[in-house]
């Protein structure tokens, strides 16, 4: 949105001419920057009404529509708006009247014309250059004066956690060397970083309503008047604003900073006289008189005359400001005196020093006025000098408005005192200069010298000086002649002293004798010398007191220097006081400038009220002026200036309650600045924003020795004053008052007494200065061009020393760096208004935008006037824009404020600098601060930034993650459904059999027993089903996350138990059906009876298996008889015996051993229907695995069974005990398979492998999983194998006994490979037994490194096993053979012991994985992710596997050292590499795949963006950025960084750089390149999750060839970008540099 062209006066005339016109255009001026008013030539336009091409006509001033002359004549003689726009303007005009708030606007206008005339006059910017008005400060009203009476507070100084040598240190102007090229062409930005930014309240700022054409700009003068009328007047209650704060937030409208020109348009001035063109910046010397002595100090005489207010108000109006400033400054001086071991108490001279130093420092700081516009030094220390005189009383110390030096006149007869003297300064020496190379006699030389001196003295006398100061010596002739002429001569004056005298007196130093005639003399009120006798501890040999002569130049006309003369009896004490004054002057000087600046901005003291009574401690050794805490008297004009100054306790044990209605009036003696932070419950703000306290709440200094500082290892709070700290030592002879570095002053919160507490929230967000430097701020600066969308200057650290040689006054920074219309950027050649400048510090970013107003100028450009105003973004918008305060002229003091201090105020959180008197919102946080000069306007906007922390791959992997449990719920739900379906089928079959058995002859004993057995089976079925329901029910409870994590291994065990139970029930039903058929045949005697279609023949029995069973029966019977078979039914037999009989009974399909089966059933503890030996044994309820024993032990001890969930405390131990906390649901599964003999295993395998006869759902129980009966894993872990999931095959293999046994044996055989392996308990196994089941273990010497005795020899393990297909449809296909080769099995096992809580966690995660379409990869290899998202499974190509085998020993060594030492590393840990082979017998198809198991860096994280960074710009851009899990590349990141830089804390940045340095150094040493840094943004936790991946590729010959081809450009590609593939060393350097550039650091308040 633009501003109308042409002169503003012409515009006003047009507005006035329209006032009497038609009402449609009487109020609004709608114009376009590219159009003129009225009739104009129109080229290639079509008439709006008739559609004909017109060459001349009228255009609508709003939408640009045109009419031909004939159409316009038919309507009106003069058309300015079309009908549509005219109607819209009328409607807008009517609405605008209703928008005027009653309390914010004056009385309604009496007529339309009156309002319009007043509008025009208010918008008129008059040219009044002839109205001379010499003013030191702009004028304000009394209500406005009451607002800024608290703006004097010093902000805490910034932290400096790095030495200057560590960063780029330079001036503010140094960074603006970027804008050095001159350019006459102007441009304006078309983009802005704030266009997509959010306001401090998180609202998107966007223009509310545009007119029809976005290119046509309209400015509504009436709306501007409404905006001015709606400005909240100073003095209006803040409480009313608070009550409507929520309503105001809701009323905010979207705002477009770039296209809404009214945002940039300056508001009316606060003082109409400020619009006058005048020579504004002149000092008013009428107020310079500070009195003859500063011996006595009082509020009325000292502070009232030096408070920097806009105009002198009444005493009552200034009282709160003077009180706050006085108390604050006295407290600061008192703390500085304590730092020099001068306790400011009532006793002794130090108490008097407090008043003296406070008075002298304040007066000196307010006297000097550095001429910063002329390039003078900003440092007040260069203008205030301190002389220590060890003579007299300390009360005789005085401030001299001029120069005092230790000099004397050359001759005693020369005049030593002048009033209003004329001072002449001469460089060099006052002697005759003999011409070299010429011969002359002695007499001739004397004569020549005499004549020459006469001539020189004659020239000097012609200027009529009274005092002549010469840098070096003077000849005796010259001295004699000067004595005769009554000119006092001073010799051997240092050049620096001459410069100071010249600066203060106005004299010009003569460089040589030849330029005496053109010299300019200086003036002062009084020149005098004084001889003083000093007192020293050790006198000289003659016991005479040493004397010195002081020379005074008093009453200098220019306020560019003064001298503080300290008197006292002890020189050492005077030196300490001198140090205090040096820092106190600096603080007072900045306090004055900051107060004026905050007053110009409209800031006020925060209004705070006590919530609870405070505690005031008393100390006898400290003087307390006020009794307790008193309330500042509130007057009607002091509403916005009332301040509660908190009182912190003295370090004393005794406390006294403080009345709730009392507040502190004096800060100096009422509080100990080491204890200024009250409990958070004691104070609260009246506003919604957080109270962080004013400057008084930030004043804490405490001196520590260097030894004490070295002991502070914990993060410390730097509770020190923002002003420079007192140096511990300074050379006694040092004339300059340079503020040297001082030892750190840190307060560790742990060192504070227990009764002291901090604002925990406020202290963390409060702005504190660092201990290493209190005189500079460290910021990150960057610049970008919005026109070319390029980064002109990447972010770099910039240290700005306050008021130092590299600092700039705020006014000069604005004029030279922002408002210079000719300077252009060296990088993009564009002007400054096409750029966006950003300064970052702590958690904030200060964005600077500049706009050139094309059609208006602010007055006072020739006089250097800079205007200030602001717009609050949180207040209700007026006509679509935030309300603006009236603009004021930047005062002279604010002009000279340090730009570094300005930045510190902008980033500071202390309450004084964050208040706006008119609305109570934060000035720095919630407002746009505008500065205008001529037709240039700049605004500063603060926006919070997220300081991200860096999360490196953890040393110990986390497995207990609740969000990833949903898939287990789904698995459990499916299992419950199948279980219920199965038991429903069994129940239906038993019910039908029960009906058939009831039809048998009741007199037959067999029929009666059979019926009873069926009834018992039905009861038992119900019990089993209930037990499964109880085991699975907790899965669906709501408090899942409280109980722990679901265990997929337990679900696997239940699934396998159900599958075996289903087949066992199917065989039982078959046997039961056989008995029913036999009974039916016995009843009817008809052998040819038709068979029940539901009844089937038993499967054919392998004769070998049957014979084996018979032999087993015999052996079991013999053993039973030998041991005494007639036992109590409560006794439990051997699990192997009962399991053998149970398998035989299910296998043989007969009742040949029913007595034995029944006995076994009884001894198992299961109740039978009756004791008949003819009864069929019910399904045996056996606890799976060895957990049955533990289950019974828990019951006997009275402990409940453990739940299905994993304990959050990790129930298993390093020994592998997994089942100790997992509940075993009851099922009809046989006892532990580890106790089964091979023959029994084969029988069970045939039972499960056969198709079920009666239970159709049994075949669907496995659901595609190979349950592999029996399981060979330890600790009862069941791992199913899926054909489409190679990771499950790996999980099964590493859980096998063979793998564990091999690892243990290998560790024992080679103890050097891993000493930790001996700590693991080796469990016994029947390895020889399993060998009979075709289990083979191969030891492969896969690679040989050097000799056979080389420690780098790494054997690999191959485990092979097979399984029959799980479903009946594929049972005939034969057994599927699996083979897993574990590369570097021992080394990876050792690594997992270090990184994983237990091997079971690793097995559990790998047991279930799913195919994953990873984004960003180009290799199209197999990718999978474990269902718990803990691991990534990636296929490894042969070249990568070969490379890894080559550097694997170094990899394991590097990780071991990093994990053990805690050294940071970014490497994403590889926890295993395996080769999986699956061979199907049908067709002989074999699948081989090399897999790598790597930790998932983003486990349990909500990642919003993912970047794959290599540090290269070649082919590193992903144009498709939409969709979830899209992997972006380097150029995508650089594109984002232009507007959204990534900021890291200094500690996080150092940790990241150190990790990258370590890892890249290792990878380069093993010749690896082409790795990537995978970065994920977790916005919820504000973390940067990252790790280095793809580090398995060495720089082999094919990569050499790729580098050469890409570098030559044969295959195309960008020529200015280096190839992605380079040598490892080059890759390392490029990678390090890029990662350092990508992630920026922001200076933080705390250092480590």
Swiss-Prot record:
Residues 97-106, 1084-1130 have a biased composition (Basic and acidic residues). SUPFAM superfamilies: GroEL apical domain-like, SAICAR synthase-like. The PI(3,5)P2 regulatory complex regulates both the synthesis and turnover of phosphatidylinositol 3,5-bisphosphate (PtdIns(3,5)P2). Catalyzes the phosphorylation of phosphatidylinositol 3-phosphate on the fifth hydroxyl of the myo-inositol ring, to form phosphatidylinositol 3,5-bisphosphate. Component of the PI(3,5)P2 regulatory complex at least composed of ATG18, SAC/FIG4, FAB1 and VAC14. Keywords: ATP-binding, Kinase, Nucleotide-binding, Transferase. The keyword Oxidoreductase does not apply. Residues 97-116, 241-276, 721-746, 1083-1139 are annotated as: Disordered. It comes from Arabidopsis thaliana. GO terms for molecular function: 1-phosphatidylinositol-3-phosphate 5-kinase activity; ATP binding. Residues 1316-1639 form the PIPK domain. Disulfide bonds: none annotated. Its EC number is 2.7.1.150. Its cofactor is Mg(2+); Mn(2+). The gene is FAB1C. GO terms for biological process: phosphatidylinositol metabolic process; stomatal closure. Pfam families: Cpn60_TCP1, PIP5K. It catalyses: a 1,2-diacyl-sn-glycero-3-phospho-(1D-myo-inositol-3-phosphate) + ATP = a 1,2-diacyl-sn-glycero-3-phospho-(1D-myo-inositol-3,5-bisphosphate) + ADP + H(+). This is Putative 1-phosphatidylinositol-3-phosphate 5-kinase FAB1C.
């Amino acid at each position: 949105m633009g501003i109308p062209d042409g002169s503003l006066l012409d515009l006003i005339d047009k507005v006035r001419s329209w006032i009497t016109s038609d009402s449609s255009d009487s109020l609004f001026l709608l114009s376009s920057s590219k159009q003129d008013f009225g009739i104009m030539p129109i080229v290639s336009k079509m008439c709006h009404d008739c559609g004909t091409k017109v060459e001349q006509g009228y255009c609508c001033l709003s939408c640009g529509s045109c009419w031909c002359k004939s159409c316009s004549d038919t309507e009106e003689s003069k058309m300015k708006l079309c009908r549509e726009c005219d109607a819209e303007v009328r409607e807008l005009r009517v609405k605008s009247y209703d928008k005027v708030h009653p309390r914010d606007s004056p009385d309604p206008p009496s007529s339309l014309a009156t309002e319009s005339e007043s509008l025009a006059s208010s918008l008129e910017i008059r040219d009044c250059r002839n109205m001379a008005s010499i003013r030191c400060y702009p004028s304000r009203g009394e209500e406005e004066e009451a607002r800024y009476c608290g703006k004097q507070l010093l902000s805490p100084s910034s932290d400096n956690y790095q030495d200057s040598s560590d960063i780029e240190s330079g001036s503010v102007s140094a960074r603006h060397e970027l804008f050095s090229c001159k350019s006459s062409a102007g441009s304006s930005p078309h983009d802005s970083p704030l266009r997509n930014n959010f306001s401090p309240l998180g609202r998107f700022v966007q223009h509310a309503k545009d007119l029809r054409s976005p290119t046509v700009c309209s400015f509504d003068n009436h709306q501007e008047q409404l905006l001015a009328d709606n400005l909240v007047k100073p003095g209006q209650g803040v409480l009313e604003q608070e009550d409507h704060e929520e309503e105001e937030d809701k009323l905010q409208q979207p705002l477009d900073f770039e296209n809404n020109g009214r945002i940039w348009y300056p508001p009316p001035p606060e003082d109409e006289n400020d619009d006058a063109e005048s020579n504004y910046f002149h000092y008013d010397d009428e107020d310079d008189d500070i009195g003859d002595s500063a011996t006595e100090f009082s509020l009325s005489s000292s502070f009232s005359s030096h408070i920097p207010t806009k105009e002198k108000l009444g005493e009552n109006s200034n009282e709160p400001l003077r009180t706050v400033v006085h108390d604050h400054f006295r407290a600061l001086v008192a703390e500085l005196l304590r730092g020099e071991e001068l306790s400011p108490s009532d006793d002794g001279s130090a108490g008097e020093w407090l008043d003296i130093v406070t008075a002298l420092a304040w007066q000196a700081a307010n006297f000097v006025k550095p001429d910063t516009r002329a390039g003078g030094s900003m440092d007040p220390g260069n203008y205030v000098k301190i002389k220590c005189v060890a003579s007299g009383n300390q009360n005789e110390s005085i401030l001299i408005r001029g120069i005092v030096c230790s000099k004397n006149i050359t001759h005693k007869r020369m005049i030593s005192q002048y009033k209003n003297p004329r001072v002449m300064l001469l460089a060099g020496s006052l002697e005759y200069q003999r011409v070299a190379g010429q011969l002359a006699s002695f007499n001739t030389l004397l004569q020549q010298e005499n004549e020459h001196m006469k001539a020189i003295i004659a020239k000097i006398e012609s200027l009529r000086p009274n005092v002549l100061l010469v840098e070096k010596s003077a000849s005796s002739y010259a001295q004699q002649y000067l004595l005769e002429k009554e000119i006092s001569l001073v010799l051997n004056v240092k050049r620096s002293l001459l410069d100071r005298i010249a600066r203060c007196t106005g004299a010009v130093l003569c460089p040589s004798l030849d330029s005496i005639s053109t010299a300019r003399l200086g003036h002062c009120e009084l020149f005098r010398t004084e001889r003083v006798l000093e007192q020293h501890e050790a006198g000289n040999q003659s016991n005479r007191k040493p004397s010195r002569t002081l020379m005074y130049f008093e009453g200098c006309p220019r306020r560019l220097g003064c001298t503080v003369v300290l008197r006292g009896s002890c020189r050492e004490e005077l030196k300490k006081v001198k140090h205090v004054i040096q820092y106190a002057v600096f603080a007072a000087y900045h306090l004055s400038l900051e107060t004026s600046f905050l007053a110009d901005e409209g800031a006020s003291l925060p209004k705070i009220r006590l919530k609870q009574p405070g505690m005031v401690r008393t100390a006898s050794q400290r003087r307390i002026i006020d009794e307790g805490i008193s309330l500042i008297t509130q007057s009607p004009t002091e509403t916005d200036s009332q301040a509660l100054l908190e009182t912190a306790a003295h370090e004393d044990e005794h406390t006294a309650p403080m009345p709730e209605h009392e507040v502190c009036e004096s800060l100096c003696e009422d509080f100990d600045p080491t204890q200024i932070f009250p409990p958070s419950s004691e104070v609260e703000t009246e506003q919604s924003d957080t109270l962080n306290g004013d400057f008084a709440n930030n004043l804490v200094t405490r001196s520590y020795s260097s030894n004490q500082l070295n002991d502070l290892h914990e993060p410390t709070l730097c509770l020190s004053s923002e002003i420079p700290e007192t140096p511990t030592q300074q050379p006694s002879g040092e004339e300059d008052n340079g503020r040297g570095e001082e030892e750190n002053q840190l307060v560790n919160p742990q060192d504070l007494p227990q009764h002291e507490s901090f604002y925990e929230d406020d202290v963390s967000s409060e702005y504190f200065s660092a201990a290493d430097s209190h005189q500079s701020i460290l910021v990150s600066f960057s610049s970008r061009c919005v026109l070319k969308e390029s980064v002109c200057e990447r972010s770099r650290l910039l240290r700005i020393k306050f008021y130092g040689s590299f600092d700039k006054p705020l006014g000069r920074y604005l004029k030279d760096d922002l408002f210079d219309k000719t300077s252009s950027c060296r990088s993009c050649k564009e002007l400054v208004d096409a750029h966006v400048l950003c300064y970052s510090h702590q958690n904030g970013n200060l964005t600077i935008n500049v706009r050139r107003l094309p059609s208006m100028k602010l007055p006072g450009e020739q006089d250097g006037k800079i205007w200030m105003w602001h717009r609050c973004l949180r207040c209700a918008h007026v006509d679509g824009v935030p309300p603006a305060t009236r603009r004021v002229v930047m005062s002279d003091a604010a002009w000279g404020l340090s730009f570094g201090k300005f930045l510190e105020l902008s980033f500071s959180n202390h309450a004084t600098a964050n208040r706006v008197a008119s609305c109570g919102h934060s000035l720095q946080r919630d407002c746009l601060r505008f500065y205008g000069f001529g037709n240039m306007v700049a605004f500063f906007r603060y926006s919070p930034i997220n300081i991200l922390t860096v999360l490196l791959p953890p040393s110990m992997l986390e497995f207990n993650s609740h969000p990833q449990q949903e898939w287990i719920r789904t698995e459990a739900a499916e299992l419950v459904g199948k279980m219920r379906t199965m038991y429903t089928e069994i129940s239906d079959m038993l019910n039908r059999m029960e009906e058939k058995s009831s039809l048998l002859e009741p007199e037959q004993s067999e029929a009666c027993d059979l019926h009873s057995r069926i009834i018992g089976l039905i009861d038992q079925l119900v019990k089993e089903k209930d037990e499964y329901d109880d085991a699975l029910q907790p899965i669906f409870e709501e408090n899942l996350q409280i109980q722990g994590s679901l265990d997929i291994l337990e679900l696997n065990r239940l699934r396998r138990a159900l599958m075996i139970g289903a087949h066992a029930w199917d065989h039982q039903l078959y046997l039961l059906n056989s008995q029913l058929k036999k009974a039916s045949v016995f009843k009817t005697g008809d052998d040819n009876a038709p068979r029940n279609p539901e009844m089937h023949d038993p499967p054919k029995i392998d004769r070998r298996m049957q014979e084996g069973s018979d032999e087993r029966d015999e052996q079991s019977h013999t053993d039973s008889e030998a041991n005494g078979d007639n036992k109590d039914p409560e006794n439990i037999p051997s699990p192997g015996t009962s399991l053998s009989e149970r398998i035989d009974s299910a296998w043989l399909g007969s009742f040949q051993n029913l007595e034995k089966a029944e006995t076994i059933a009884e001894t198992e503890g299961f109740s039978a229907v009756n004791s008949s030996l003819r009864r069929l044994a019910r399904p045996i309820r056996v606890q799976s695995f060895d957990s049955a024993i533990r289950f019974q032990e828990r019951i006997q001890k009275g402990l409940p069974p453990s739940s299905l969930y994993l304990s959050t405390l990790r129930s298993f131990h390093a020994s592998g005990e997994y089942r100790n906390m997992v509940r075993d649901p009851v099922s009809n599964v046989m006892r532990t398979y580890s106790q089964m003999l091979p023959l029994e295993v084969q029988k069970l395998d045939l039972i499960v492998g056969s198709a079920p006869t009666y239970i159709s759902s049994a075949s669907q129980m496995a659901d595609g999983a190979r349950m592999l009966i029996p399981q060979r894993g330890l600790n009862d872990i069941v791992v199913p194998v899926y054909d489409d999931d190679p990771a499950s095959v790996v999980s099964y293999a590493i859980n096998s006994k063979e793998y564990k046994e091999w690892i243990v044996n290998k560790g024992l055989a080679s103890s050097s490979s891993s000493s930790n392996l001996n700590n693991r308990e080796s469990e016994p196994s029947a390895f020889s037994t399993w060998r009979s089941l075709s289990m083979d273990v191969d030891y492969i010497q896969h690679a040989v490194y050097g000799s056979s005795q080389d420690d780098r020899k790494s054997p690999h393990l191959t485990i092979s096993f097979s399984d029959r297909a799980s479903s009946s449809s594929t049972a005939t296909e034969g057994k599927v053979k699996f083979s897993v080769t574990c590369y570097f099995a021992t080394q990876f096992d050792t690594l997992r012991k270090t990184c994983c809580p237990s091997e079971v966690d690793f097995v559990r995660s790998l047991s279930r994985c799913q195919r994953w379409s990873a984004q960003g990869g180009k290799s199209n290899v197999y990718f999978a992710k474990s269902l718990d998202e803990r691991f990534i499974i990636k296929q490894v190509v042969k070249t990568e596997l070969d490379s890894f085998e080559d550097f694997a020993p170094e990899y394991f060594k590097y990780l071991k050292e990093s994990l053990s030492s805690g050294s940071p590393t970014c490497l994403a840990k590889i926890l295993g590499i395996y080769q999986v082979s699956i061979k199907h017998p049908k067709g002989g198809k074999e699948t081989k795949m090399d897999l790598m198991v790597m930790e998932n860096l983003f486990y349990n994280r909500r990642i919003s963006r993912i970047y794959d960074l290599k540090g290269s710009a070649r082919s590193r851009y992903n144009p498709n950025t939409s969709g979830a899990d899209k992997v972006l590349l380097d150029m995508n990141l650089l594109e984002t960084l232009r507007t959204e830089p990534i900021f890291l804390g200094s500690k996080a940045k150092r940790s990241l750089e150190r990790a990258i340095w370590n890892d890249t150094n290792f990878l380069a040493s093993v010749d690896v390149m082409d790795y990537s840094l995978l970065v994920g943004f977790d916005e919820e936790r504000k973390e940067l999750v990252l790790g280095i991946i793809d580090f398995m590729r060495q720089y082999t010959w094919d990569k050499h060839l790729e580098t050469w081809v890409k570098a030559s450009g044969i295959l195309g590609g960008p020529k200015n970008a280096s190839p992605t593939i380079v040598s490892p060393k080059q890759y390392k350097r490029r990678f390090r540099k890029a990662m350092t550039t990508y992630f920026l650091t922001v200076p933080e308040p705390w250092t480590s």
